[in-house]
A protein has these predicted regions:
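N-terminal export signals
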Residues: 2, 8-30
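Core beta-strand elements of the Rossmann-like FAD/NAD(P) dinucleotide-binding domain
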Residues: 56-58, 244-254
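Glycine-rich FAD pyrophosphate-binding loop
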Residues: 79-98
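Glycine-rich loop(s) and the adjacent beta-strand/alpha-helix scaffold that form part
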Residues: 250-318
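Beta1/beta-strand and adjacent pyrophosphate-binding region of the FAD-binding site
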Residues: 54-66
């Protein structure tokens, strides 16, 4: 059975997060013997966990089957854990934003350069040094992880710094901010010969399926509540709406929340981002449920005003679509003849169509 420290687990999961454009990961620490002793109610040694009618038990429960959820579940299972991986989407419609993103992986062999670049990207924002170090360490191991653990053949990798002929605009990401320290040591990779084809997501999904002896997957099963010991504050389980039936699952060694954002929750978008008109470019299932559950057990919020428009698409401009549809964006007007302009509802032109946009800072 494999052995992983807490930092190694977070770093490995962090690789997955970075590879899928910053998907969120938060882990709840397992109970220690001291925690369990503190949680005794004094009623004959009964613990808080004993007061709940459990319908099942796993070593680890992972909420959200996107890239970060898949990576977390696979590493936990590799360490010998019995894992439950749940997702609110139906089978065939899951994958979170990992499925819809460009499948582009930031990578470097130089950890110090990666660290310097990420710190420069953070600008004046205060970011925990240990978190920054974990990201930099993980991003230097991305290719090795995908090759050795997830089974991507060496010949499948494409380094777009060396060859961007399939999609010339990808060259702008190598690096995206060349003026920042460390940028010259960065590369971007894909696990296939193109982008926006869900290839990275399929790699993660296939690994999860191959570990079905240790990983159970429940679709159409959103988490609705976290069970938190009132004394130790440890999260010990999850309430799940499994296809309309409420089930309580105990997590003996922790709950991992890879729950995506809130881009499909109009009230949260208005409250946190100040937007009254927006259209999701990725999954239609990110409605902020996990954010609310995390707040319910005392989690602080950070960077809730930060969001990304499609950097390929003139800063995220979309045609008007129905609420149950993905954004329909302009991908790259520079590939056209030069005879196209973009105007708003009032007929005004307010941007340059002949230049690329860039992502905002971290």
């Amino acid at each position: 059975m494999g052995k992983y420290t807490r930092r190694q687990f977070i770093t490995s999961a962090g690789v997955g997060m970075a590879a899928v454009a910053g998907l969120g990961l938060a882990g709840c620490a397992p109970q220690t013997p001291a925690d369990k002793a503190m949680a005794n109610t004094g009623n004959g040694g009964t613990t808080f966990a004993d007061t709940i009618a459990w319908d099942g038990e796993y070593d680890v429960v992972v909420i959200g089957f996107g890239g970060a959820g898949a990576v977390s579940a696979c590493y936990a299972a590799d360490a010998g854990a019995k894992v439950l991986l749940i997702d609110k989407a139906p089978q065939g419609m899951g994958g979170g934003n990992t499925r819809f993103c460009g499948q582009i992986i930031l990578n470097s062999d130089d950890k110090e350069a990666m660290l310097a670049y990420n710190k420069a990207m953070a600008g004046d924002f205060a970011v925990d040094d240990e978190l920054m170090d974990a990201y930099a360490e993980g991003l230097t191991q991305t290719k090795t992880m995908l090759r050795d653990f997830f089974g991507v053949p060496e010949e499948n990798f494409l380094d777009w710094k060396e060859d961007s002929s399939a999609q010339p605009m990808i060259a702008m990401f190598v690096p995206e901010y060349p003026e920042l320290e460390g940028g010259d040591a960065l590369h971007v990779l894909t696990v296939s010969d193109n982008v926006c084809n869900s290839a990275l997501w399929k790699t993660y999904r296939n690994k999860v399926m191959s570990m079905s002896d240790n990983i159970d997957v429940w679709y159409m099963s959103p988490a609705t509540k976290l069970f938190q010991d009132p004394v130790s504050r440890a999260v010990i389980g999850v309430e799940i709406d499994k296809a309309g039936e409420t089930v309580n699952i105990r997590a003996k060694n922790g709950v991992v929340m890879t729950i995506g954002g809130f881009e499909n929750n109009k009230q949260m978008v208005e409250d946190f981002l100040g937007l009254t008109k927006s259209t999701p470019a990725g999954t239609l299932f990110n409605t902020g449920d996990g954010v609310k559950m995390a707040m319910g057990v005392g989690a602080d919020l950070w960077h809730m005003e930060a969001y990304e428009g499609n950097c390929f698409a003139l800063g995220g401009i979309s045609f008007v679509v129905n609420e149950d549809q993905h954004a329909k964006t302009f991908n790259d007007l520079r590939n056209l003849s030069g005879s196209v302009i973009v105007v708003g509802n009032g007929g005004e032109r307010n941007l340059r169509e002949d230049v690329y946009n860039r992502h905002g800072h971290v």
